[in-house]
Structures are given as structure tokens and as C-alpha cells.
Amino acid sequence: MSGPRTLFEKIWSTHVVCVPDDQPPILYIDRHYVHEVTSPQAFDGLRAAGRKVRRTDLTFATVDHNVPTTSPRLVIKDDVAARQIDALRTNCAAFGVPLFDLTSEEQGIVHVIGPELGLTLPGMTIVCGDSHTSTHGAFGAFAFGIGTSEVEHVLATQCLPQRKPKTMKIEVSGTLPEGVTAKDLALGIIGKLGTDGATGHVIEYCGTAIRALSMEARMTLCNMSIEGGARAGLIGPDEITFAYIRNRQYAPKGAEWDTGVAEWAALNTDEGAKFDREIHINAADLQPQVTWGTNPGMVVSVGANVPDPKATSDDAQRQSYERALTYMDLKPGTPVAQIAVDRVFIGSCTNSRIEDLRAAAKVVSGYHVAATVHAMVVPGSQRIKAKAEEEGLDRVFRDAGFEWRESGCSMCLGMNPDILSPGQRCASTSNRNFEGRQGRGGRTHLVSPAMAAAAAITGHFTDIREWEYK
């Protein structure tokens, strides 16, 4: 197309291989991340068809969803989890795919280690059999989750049929107030849009508040794009992006680096480019957020009350609210700050990076977890764990009564030993609060790392803006 183009349109146009008659365009894929849960059948399909992995140099695997976060890590008690992990090891060895296994210092959550290792780069198309692949869009990449059959397709061809999504601009002006984080921004946006407000769109986040975010904060924001229904979320690369990538293990070096930066600097939305939809948000209006229901759009500020379903005139929404309140065992009008928690989970591909752990450690330093609370911290990768231990953050957490774990997806989802018991209520830094997400009958409230840390100490949700740091 001619004329001003959006960042997404620039990436899309350079990756379309061909457009078959009456078929979706064929998109070339620059990076394919693989994990143990959505890959076994895909590799089986390759084997049955006698095919190879087309580009093993563009494919990287890790174990994260099912892995234990306690020692000994190599003892996997769940039979299904053990079979999936063993299958990934067998398949990676057979097909020549690099694997960051449990014994590797590079192991971690797939959406944490990709950027951490310098594998995620601006302008790329990136896929993984996981919905939160949108995380990598923080680097100015078109990154999206795919299903198992599509995993097989990419393994075999390094391409994927894809219909072109619509575009949405979310411009966040101003400055985030003290105590308000990228997680609060993400939840605030989803609360405004709803969980289907961005369906069929790729979101580009822009504005002064976005430019002020660190790369780790940008990853948190893009990670949760899918929770608003978006296909992907992305942020144009800038000097903050380049500084993060520079000198990472797999990042370009020397002349290739200089060439890369020059190309990446052009990856921005042209002035006058048109979006299918635009949303404008004033960062100054945001407050720390807490979800109260069973999807991320059921969210209010920490100083608000649990909403009353009777206040809405929409029958479907009222019924949804009523069901959520029943499941969450909450009453309308209850102040959020009076909701007590049993568990606190700091981790996940949303909030398990070093900045997240630093923020939480700052809150708990000098305090101790409430007697009624069981709290745990799960670093997003072994490298983050090592960095945190180098900084003494593990001691801060342990002294405060937190469990300090090995890396993995952990309590984000009920696919490993880290789950809630029925009826337990958890302040979680993860991205989904669906019924049973953290274990059958478990009740999940999504918050930022600092808010989760404060809840662990007080035993209930607490406005982090009023916290007395020691």
C-alpha cells in the first residue's frame, strides 16, 4: 500500500510471501518458540509425514508450563507432565531443535527467556503455541499465539496462513502516578475495553506514558493485550529497546548490530497513518487496580467497592457479574481493601522479571508475611533467579516469610504442583483470573507485584500508594 503506514502494516508487508486466490496470505515467520504442552502432537505430525523442521536455527524450545518449581527439579511426579517434558526432549533431539532444559541456566518461561536471550528482535514475526506470545510485541514485533496444528505448520514450512487483522491505536498521554504500574495500566485498559473490545485487532500502544516505560514494563503491557481480545499488541522500538537488546547472548554483534539498529529505527508508525480504531487514555487518571471477578475486565481501583450487578442495565452483563460474585464469594459493595487473601503469587510471564522482583522486595523489606497468608515468589527464568540472588532479593523475600522458588509458569495455571485449594483466595501477578485457572475452586485477583507484596504483609488488599517503606 502507498501513503503513511502503521508499524504493523510495515511488518506485515515485508513478511507476506504470497496471497493465494481465495485464501489467507502466507506469512513468513522469523522466530518460533516451542514448549512442552502444545508441541507433542505437532512433532508427531512431522514424524508421521516424514518431514523435518525446516529452520532449526529459527526455532527454540524450553520447558516451563509443567515444570516443578521446587527441588529436586528433575523429579516430576505428575505422569502427564513427565510425559510431555520427556516428549519435548526426545523431539528436540530427533529434529535438531535447541532446547533450554531444566539443567540449563537459560531455562525459564518462554516469554521471559526469548527477550532475555536476545532472540526477540524488532520487526520480527514471532509465534508460539501460547496465547501470551503477544509479550514480544514490546520490541516492535508482530507476535501472536497459535494452536498445535499451526505449530506443526510452522515447524514444517516456516510459514503460516494468516488473515490480516485490523489495527487499533491506544495512546496513553501524561505520566503514570506514583504507585501505578504497567500492570495497572493493562488492567485499566481491559476494564475500559472489555475482554472482547480489541477482538480482531492488533493494538499499537503509543504516547508519552508508553515511551516512559522500561522494556520490562512494556512486556507486561503487551503480554495482556490478548486479555482485551487483541490478536497482538506492539510498541514501536526506540533507544530504550536498543539498550535492552544490546550485547544479549543471541543479539546481533558488530556490523550486524549497526545495520540492525538502523533498520529498527525506521520501524515506527508514519505521521498521518490511519488506524481502524483509536483509544485515548490519560495516565494521570489511573490508580492501582484489583480484579474482583472471573475475567480481567472485571476490575476496579483498590479504593473502590465490589460492583453491584443491579447497577447495570445489560442483562448479560448482570448475569455474568452475579455468577462471578458467587464464584468469588464476594458481596456487592464490599470495599476492595477489606478483601482478605490466603495466598500470594508473584511470578508468571506477566510479572516475574527482575524489575518486578525488585519492586516486590522493596515493599516487603523489614516486614513479615501475615500469619494467615502463604506467599511465594517464582522468578521467570534461571538467569533472573541468579540475578535476584546476586542482589540479595531472595534473602529479603525469605526473611519476610516468602517461599523462593525455581523458574517456571508455576501458579499462573493449574498444570503443575503449584495450585490453589478449593476456596482459597490469591493475590496474583499473573494474567488470567478465570474460574479454576489456578486450581479447581481457586479464586484469583490480578494485581501488580507491589500490590501483591503488600497484600502478603497485611493479609488483605492495600493501597500501595499509602505504603510505609522501611
From Swiss-Prot:
Any single GO BP term: L-leucine biosynthetic process
Matches recorded under InterPro entries: 3-IsopropMal_deHydase_lsu (IPR004430), Acnase/IPM_dHydase_lsu_aba_1/3 (IPR015931), Acoase/IPM_deHydtase_lsu_aba (IPR001030), Aconitase_4Fe-4S_BS (IPR018136), Aconitase_4Fe-4S_dom (IPR036008), IPM_dehydratase_rel_enz (IPR050067), IPMI_cat (IPR033941)
List of residues binding [4Fe-4S] cluster: C349, C409, C412
This protein's record includes keyword Transmembrane: no
Cofactor binding annotation: Binds 1 [4Fe-4S] cluster per subunit.
SUPFAM superfamilies, sorted: Aconitase iron-sulfur domain
Claim: Flavoprotein is one of the keywords in the record: no
Cofactor(s) for this UniProt protein: [4Fe-4S] cluster
Disulphide bonds in the chain: none
EC number: 4.2.1.33
Pathway: Amino-acid biosynthesis; L-leucine biosynthesis; L-leucine from 3-methyl-2-oxobutanoate: step 2/4
Highest taxon, organism lineage: Bacteria
GO molecular function, one term: metal ion binding
Enzyme class: lyase
Catalytic reaction equation(s): (2R,3S)-3-isopropylmalate = (2S)-2-isopropylmalate
Keywords for this protein: 4Fe-4S, Amino-acid biosynthesis, Branched-chain amino acid biosynthesis, Iron, Iron-sulfur, Leucine biosynthesis, Lyase, Metal-binding
PANTHER family in the record: 3-ISOPROPYLMALATE DEHYDRATASE, HOMOACONITASE, MITOCHONDRIAL-RELATED
Assembly and binders: Heterodimer of LeuC and LeuD.
Sequence similarity: Belongs to the aconitase/IPM isomerase family. LeuC type 1 subfamily.
Protein role: Catalyzes the isomerization between 2-isopropylmalate and 3-isopropylmalate, via the formation of 2-isopropylmaleate.
Protein name in the entry: 3-isopropylmalate dehydratase large subunit
Native source organism of the sequence: Koribacter versatilis (strain Ellin345)
